[in-house]
A protein has these predicted regions:
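Non-ligating segments of multi-cofactor redox enzymes
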Residues: 1-196
Length: 196
């Protein structure tokens, strides 16, 4: 994923709303504990005082610390690089939540009803952005957040296959000199940001 922070609009929640709808994430009015697979954050450049807003989600690290600390292997990285949680083997210890430097994981505290059958979830499990695998595995080429951002007219999010040098996201990443968040951690994330 590539995110152009200059195109991300303060106050817009199109990407968050689309993710919530796609994955059946309904809040209980408790922002501190409600599941957030993607959230909008504000950052400030201390040298210029520029304040920007941007979406923050699982960074799909090449070297994911969440997988390293998981005692059951429930946190895992697929061959295509997508980092996921196996709801059947997650024991809810939340070590992965503590290990994630991006606070990109949520814990399901409540019993869930009326779930989206494409994205089953379970009480007592950890969860995070899975790059809409329910769509991608069935041939879709975009995520819900990208579609929503495009529909809103911002075009801040570009999704695709970073291993395909001719893909739209690869072209954007190679031409914009983007950076990774907390590059000092050497996690080799697959989410890139420009203009931050």
């Amino acid at each position: 994923i590539h995110i152009d922070v200059d195109k991300c609009v303060d106050g817009c929640t199109a990407c968050v709303d689309a993710c919530n709808e796609e994955n059946g994430l309904t809040g209980f009015g408790r922002p501190e504990t409600d599941s957030q697979w993607i959230r909008k954050v504000k950052i400030q450049d201390n040298t210029t005082n520029k304040i920007s807003t941007m979406p923050l989600m699982c960074q799909h690290c090449e070297n994911p610390p969440c997988c390293d600390v998981c005692p059951t292997g429930a946190s895992f990285k697929r061959e295509d690089g997508i980092v996921m949680v196996n709801q059947h083997t997650c024991i809810g210890c939340r070590y992965c939540m503590m290990a994630c430097p991006f606070k990109a994981r949520s814990f399901v505290h409540e019993t869930l009803t009326q779930q989206n059958t494409n994205a089953p979830r379970g009480k007592g499990c950890v969860e995070s952005c899975n790059l809409c695998v329910n769509r991608i595995d069935h041939g879709a080429e975009t995520t819900a957040c990208e579609d929503a951002c495009t529909k809103a007219g911002h075009n801040a999010i570009t999704f695709g296959d970073l291993k395909d040098s001719s893909s739209k996201v690869s072209v954007v990443v190679s031409s914009n000199s983007p950076r990774r968040l907390r590059n000092d951690l050497n996690l080799q994330q697959k989410v890139f940001y420009s203009n931050i």
